[in-house]
A protein has these predicted regions:
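Residue-level preference for the first positions of well-ordered beta-strands
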Residues: 1-3, 31-33, 80, 116-118
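Conserved catalytic-core segment of NTP-binding enzymes
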Residues: 94-175
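Amphipathic alpha-helical interaction surfaces in cytosolic regulatory modules
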Residues: 17-22, 135, 139
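A short, flexible beta-alpha/helix-coil linker loop
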Residues: 9, 41, 87-90
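Glycine-rich phosphate-binding P-loop
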Residues: 3-19, 25
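Phosphate-binding loop that captures ATP/GTP phosphates
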Residues: 20-85, 147
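Acidic-aromatic/histidine active-site loop/patch
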Residues: 1, 62, 173
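Residue-level signature of catalytic and energy-coupling elements of molecular machines
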Residues: 4, 38, 60, 83, ...
Length: 175
């Protein structure tokens, strides 16, 4: 399970998460599940042109949907499945930190050896959600906007993550 988190809003975290998911999906032996965990500003369903009919992550976590498979949507790319946010929610920390979220990630992790789960998180410096989600993942990648996010902002964002899980920083929008 890989967490992708932008340093700040607009750094391109969702863009990098989506492109990483697509790259992993090119491996014909692997399935990829991309989870939109940005509950306040979800965008992956729009970028993949997925019509969210049955709800999504929030609906599953709040118990309105019992079967996770009901809120997993084909992305249009082979081997890439999207779990969209579904119903928007402003107060998200309690929901993402709930035991049902951890259980969901554990069940996705155990589905098969060749499943990669990528969590698209909100900005690390704008929400406690990233810190909460990072405790459930195997590794984390920060996305810094090149020429936009200062070294101090990158350092501040990386401080919310466990250094043992921080795989590195991706610089986005390099000229």
């Amino acid at each position: 399970v890989l967490l992708v988190a932008p340093v700040a809003r607009g750094s391109g975290g969702s863009y990098v998460a989506l492109n990483l998911a697509a790259a992993f999906a090119f491996d014909e032996t692997r399935q990829v599940i991309l989870v939109d965990c940005n509950l306040r500003q979800p965008c992956l369903h729009q970028r993949l042109d997925v019509e969210v009919r049955n709800g999504g992550l929030v609906d599953y976590l709040e118990g309105r949907v019992d079967n996770l498979a009901d809120v997993l949507y084909p992305s249009g790319l082979a081997r890439l499945t999207l779990l969209p946010v579904g119903t928007r929610r402003e107060a998200s920390g309690d929901l993402l930190g709930h035991a049902r979220m951890r259980g969901m990630i554990d069940s996705l992790r155990s589905v098969a050896e060749k499943v990669t789960v990528i969590l698209d998180a909100p900005a690390a410096n704008a929400s406690p959600d990233t810190r909460i989600l990072a405790t459930m993942t195997d590794c984390c990648v920060l996305v810094a906007g090149y020429g936009r996010d200062t070294p101090a902002a990158v350092q501040s964002a990386s401080a919310v993550l466990d250094p043992q899980r921080l795989a590195g920083v991706v610089f986005n929008r390099v000229p």
